[in-house]
Amino acid sequence: LTSDQVAELTILIRDVVIECVGEQKASDVFVKTSTGFYKPEDGGHGGASVDDVSIMSINAGPLKVKASGGIYSREDLEKMVDAGASRIGTSAGIEIIRGEKANTDY
């Protein structure tokens, strides 16, 4: 998706959530970047990108952003938090806590 499409989808999700649960409860809802369970044609990882998390964070309020997929190290995690993620989805939690970089093929 393009940056504009990420922003538009985030705004759409935000508006639907606010319409359904109200603005006060919307702050309990997360908009999620991706599942991470796909491989792009360019061979990169199919997870969250710092740019997408930043765009989503700017446009999601009052919803929070969950960065999911492609987060395999403490450095990856810190970049996502700095970009605006409030929650991290990763299969590498133990490795991140140990200060290691996880090796995974999905």
Feature locations, PLM:
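Alpha/beta enzyme core
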Residues: L1-V65, S73-I96, N103-Y106
